[in-house]
């Protein structure tokens, strides 16, 4: 869980090999990685002015009772999981766009908010349904022509894919078309 939070670059300051979401490389063993809460996390999530605290189990430290977060962190980070038979998938969103949407909401203004992915890519939101159940998005790699139009350069990959899985799918498609 800590590695996944650390790879999202918002709550955890990381040091060591935390893996790579682009290549799918895993993180090093826990003894080789270090983590601390980021300044953002200390201000927005663990702020002593907005968080209620209680003594820890042995009374030497304090721990938060609840985490009243001043920012829609769930939308920024995104989440996917299942518990007690209920599946959930919330796509990540752009930090700055979330701030603008929060301000618009507080001013009772309309706003539009679409998912934004850390790996980039081109997104089709024509069937998004404003994030409601049944909606979906399609994400494609961003490809540019290079070397006098003789080569293709993939500059952004779809969210949830790794470079190796993208290469494998390109090889599979190319073999299929070469045989035809």
Predicted regions and their residues:
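Gly-rich Lys/Arg/Thr-decorated short loops/hinges at beta-loop-alpha junctions or inter-strand turns
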Residues: 49-53, 147-152
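Fungal transcription factor middle regulatory core
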Residues: 133-144, 150
């Amino acid at each position: 869980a800590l590695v996944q939070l650390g790879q999202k670059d918002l709550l955890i300051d990381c040091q060591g090999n935390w893996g790579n979401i682009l290549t799918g490389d895993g993180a090093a063993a826990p003894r080789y990685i270090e983590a601390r809460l980021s300044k953002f996390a200390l201000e927005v999530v663990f702020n002593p002015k907005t968080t209620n605290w209680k003594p820890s189990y042995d009374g030497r430290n304090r721990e938060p009772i609840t985490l009243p977060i001043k920012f829609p962190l769930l939308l920024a980070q995104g989440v996917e999981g299942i518990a007690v038979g209920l599946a959930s998938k919330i796509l990540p969103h752009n930090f700055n766009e979330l701030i603008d949407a929060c301000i618009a909401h507080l001013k009772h203004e309309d706003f539009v908010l679409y998912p934004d992915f850390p790996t980039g890519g081109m997104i089709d939101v024509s069937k998004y349904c404003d994030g409601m159940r049944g909606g979906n998005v399609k994400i494609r790699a961003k490809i540019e022509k290079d070397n006098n139009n003789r080569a293709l350069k993939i500059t952004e990959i779809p969210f949830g894919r790794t470079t190796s899985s993208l290469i494998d799918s390109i090889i599979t498609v190319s073999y299929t078309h070469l045989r035809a």
